[in-house]
């Protein structure tokens, strides 16, 4: 009876908007989504402990008074990872925050549920990139969607690392639908962009949000951007709840294969004060993005999430330098000139010519 009522209400809404009807999620959608992201947290933590060799995650469980809770796992002072965290959360409530209602006003007035896993790793060695991922699921009455992504933030440029990370996630996306990576790659470049610096946070990866069973893939905020253009050219790409569930699972499981080979290749590279200082300086961009632009941070703070877990993404050490300019022709200059602007990492052969003089190929 309840599901029939939802269908009638939803049908009226969709008919008014002249858009396809939203598929209802499975009756066990919340349990399955919760199990999926908890499983990803377990798999990733086990893989990272093996990769580090010495560091171990310390777990802290927490309860949200308004409903829900989670478990935060943090590694400090490992052999490879200076600090890293892998979170799981499941939260629910009756009043949605403004950041959600602005995007999906039809969710207003419905009790809501959200679950997800998020991770940020800050390696010690400047030649190993910082990495981030987040996969999540949201429901509010008849409204539901999946979101997620992963992105790589190098401090020293290596074309092979960027290509490997992108290729691995492209394969994961293609296992669900061939259109996905074509939109989610430029969407990632768009999302992880520091407008006040006019640069991307790193070399990107994939990003997607508000994915339900309707319409075109791009549901972002720049209707004239590259992701919107590709999405419009591809047209409607209807995906079922099951396909979108598989998308999060496939990309979550692609994380270790996308990142572990980079760590194994770079962790023994020697470095000095110059490289460490540049790493700490570039970490400042990470802090700026997360505190100024990141919607996940904003959502967590607006919904009385656990502050320690929300800000777990910040690096343990960071520095700012007024008016810094990289030395012309240096690897630091290549990083800031090439690796902080959107590139066709998998399809542009000219990148090799730009990287080769700086030993940034292998």
UniProtKB/Swiss-Prot annotation:
Its main location: cytoplasm. It comes from the Bacteria. It catalyses: coproporphyrinogen III + O2 + 2 H(+) = protoporphyrinogen IX + 2 CO2 + 2 H2O. A divalent metal cation binds at residues 122, 132, 166, 196. Its cofactor is a divalent metal cation. The keyword Metal-binding applies. It is an enzyme of class 1 (oxidoreductase). Substrate binds at residues 118, 134-136. Its EC number is 1.3.3.3. GO terms for biological process: chlorophyll biosynthetic process; protoporphyrinogen IX biosynthetic process. The active site is at 132 (proton donor). The record marks 196 as: Important for dimerization. Residues 12-31 are annotated as: Disordered. Pfam families: Coprogen_oxidas. Belongs to the aerobic coproporphyrinogen-III oxidase family. Involved in the heme and chlorophyll biosynthesis. Catalyzes the aerobic oxidative decarboxylation of propionate groups of rings A and B of coproporphyrinogen-III to yield the vinyl groups in protoporphyrinogen-IX. PANTHER family: COPROPORPHYRINOGEN III OXIDASE, MITOCHONDRIAL, OXYGEN-DEPENDENT COPROPORPHYRINOGEN-III OXIDASE, MITOCHONDRIAL. This is Oxygen-dependent coproporphyrinogen-III oxidase.
